[in-house]
Amino acid sequence: MLPFILFSTLLPLIFTESEQQLWFCNSSDATFSYSYCDSMKFPFSITAEPCITLKGTNGFLHIKFIPRRDLKKLYFNLSINVNSIEVPTRKEIICHGYDDNYSFCKALKGETVNTVVPFSFKGILFPKGQYRCVAEAIVGDNEEKLFCLNFTIIHHPNVN
């Protein structure tokens, strides 16, 4: 009986594929990577210029993908975990369907979205540790999942 219990317990661990971490960038105080957090993997490219430092940088994120749905209404569910402490999930509306700030909000299914989004961390102090952010993109009136990405940030500030 014991071999059966051990086999049934270890079998899922043997055949479970570990999620591949895709490198984002490596700066002087942080390492950024992401992986897919659902089974709907599709080509998605994200790069930062310059690579993000959490001690106060600003720059641009270059994002490129081909949506599987029209982007008339788009929002993100953002779940953040800081050093194993859960922060309440935040819903961030990106495209309302009218009077939108981003040009890609009118993109149709199958059109390539190639956009640049500014970022800034000036004035924000991040404690040392590991940050995880799950960004789940939801589109349309039927609220269909467009994609889900799991970002990992390891912050290792230099102590001088």
From Swiss-Prot:
The entry's function note states: Binds bacterial lipopolysaccharide (LPS). Cooperates with TLR4 in the innate immune response to bacterial lipopolysaccharide (LPS), and with TLR2 in the response to cell wall components from Gram-positive and Gram-negative bacteria. Enhances TLR4-dependent activation of NF-kappa-B. Cells expressing both LY96 and TLR4, but not TLR4 alone, respond to LPS.
Q: Taking the first listed entry, what is the main subcellular location of this protein, grouped into a coarse class?
A: secreted
Where does it live in the cell?
Secreted, Extracellular space; Secreted
User: One GO CC term of this entry?
Assistant: plasma membrane
Q: Where is this region: Interaction with lipopolysaccharide?
A: 119-123
Q: What is this protein called?
A: Lymphocyte antigen 96
Q: What are the protein's UniProt keywords?
A: Disulfide bond, Glycoprotein, Immunity, Inflammatory response, Innate immunity, Secreted, Signal
Query: Domain of life of the organism in this record?
Result: Eukaryota
Could you say what the effect of mutating residue 95 to Y is? In endotoxin nonresponder
Name of the coding gene = LY96
Q: Name the Gene3D superfamilies on file.
A: 2.60.40.770
GO molecular function terms listed in the Swiss-Prot or TrEMBL record: lipopolysaccharide binding; lipopolysaccharide immune receptor activity; Toll-like receptor 4 binding
Subunit-structure text: Heterogeneous homomer formed from homodimers; disulfide-linked. Belongs to the lipopolysaccharide (LPS) receptor, a multi-protein complex containing at least CD14, LY96 and TLR4. Binds to the extracellular domains of TLR2 and TLR4. Ligand binding induces interaction with TLR4 and oligomerization of the complex.
The intrachain disulfides are 25-51, 37-148, 95-105
Q: Where is the signal peptide?
A: 1-16
InterPro entries noted in UniProt: Ig_E-set, LY96, ML_dom
Q: In the UniProt record, which residues carry a glycan? A: 26, 77, 101, 150
Which BP terms does GO give this entry?
cellular response to lipopolysaccharide; detection of lipopolysaccharide; inflammatory response; innate immune response; lipopolysaccharide-mediated signaling pathway; positive regulation of lipopolysaccharide-mediated signaling pathway; positive regulation of tumor necrosis factor production; toll-like receptor 4 signaling pathway
Entry PTM: N-glycosylated.
